[in-house]
C-alpha cells in the first residue's frame, strides 16, 4: 500500500503514522527545505500514475486552510480515502460537493481525538455526570500572528477553525444525541489586535500582516460547555472537567497513537458504507457549527 501526504508541517506526523502501518509514503511540499519527495503535486501524481498500478490507499491534506478544497479535489481521483486536516473546507456545502463529485473516494475530516485509546472511559464518565466542560485554552499561543492563520479570508476563522473542531468531535463522542442537538450558545469573538500579540513557539509576529479572526470561541450544547482560546493571560488549560462526582482529565496534545488508530480504522472499514455515512454526518455537522460564527 502507498499513501500521499501533502504539506510537511503536521504532515510529518502522518508520515510517521503511515510508516508505522507499513505503508509507503509519497510526500509533497512546495518548500524544498522540508525535503519532500516532490515539490509539485501535479508531478507527484503523474509519477504515481505512471509507475504504480492501482490507487493510493490514503491521501492527507495538511496544507493551509484556503488550499484544502483544491488539494483534496486534485488528489481524490488517485486515492481511496482522503483525510483533510481541520477545519476541513469553508462550508458544509463545499464538503458535500467534494463527496458528491468523487463517488469512488471516501473523505474524512480529521477527528483524531475520537480515536484516543481511552475514549471509551471518557464517554462513560460523560454519560454519568450532570455537566461536562471541554477546554482547549492556550496561554498566549496565537499561531503566526499576521500570517494566513490570522487572515479570515484565508483561514476562514481563528480559534473557531483551529481548536474548536477538536472539542466538537469530542462532544460528538460523548453525546449520543448530537445529531438533533441545538447549541444554546455559539460565539466567536476577537479580543486582541495585532500590535498586542507577541512571538511564541507557535510563530513570529508579522507586524505588516492581518489579524481579523476570532481568538475566543464558546459553545453550550445540552450539558456540555466548550471553550477554545488562543490567548489566555493566566495558564494553559487543556482538559475535560466532569462534575458530580468531580473528575478532571488532562488532554494535553493528542497522542500519535490516536492518529494511527484513526487511519487504520478507516482503512479497515473501507467497504463499510454505514461507517462512511456516519463519518459524513459528523463532518457535515462540524462544518455547520463553525461556518457562520
Model regions and ranges:
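C-terminal helix-rich "cap/oligomerization" subdomain common to oxidoreductases
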Residues: 19, 28, 40, 56-63, ...
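Residues at the starts of beta-strands that form the adenosine-phosphate
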Residues: 2, 24-26, 81, 106, ...
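A contiguous active-site-proximal alpha/beta segment in oxidoreductase catalytic domains
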Residues: 52, 66, 89-146
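Beta-loop-alpha module in the N-terminal Rossmann-like domain of NAD(P)-dependent dehydrogenases
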Residues: 14, 36-99, 118
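Predominantly a Rossmann-like dinucleotide-binding segment in NAD(P)-dependent oxidoreductases
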Residues: 116-184, 189-198
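Local beta-strand N-terminus motif with an aromatic residue
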Residues: 24, 55-59, 129
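N-terminal Rossmann-like dinucleotide-binding module
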Residues: 1-37, 286
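Contiguous beta-strand/loop segments that form the cofactor/metal-binding neighborhood of enzyme cores
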Residues: 162, 166-256, 263-270
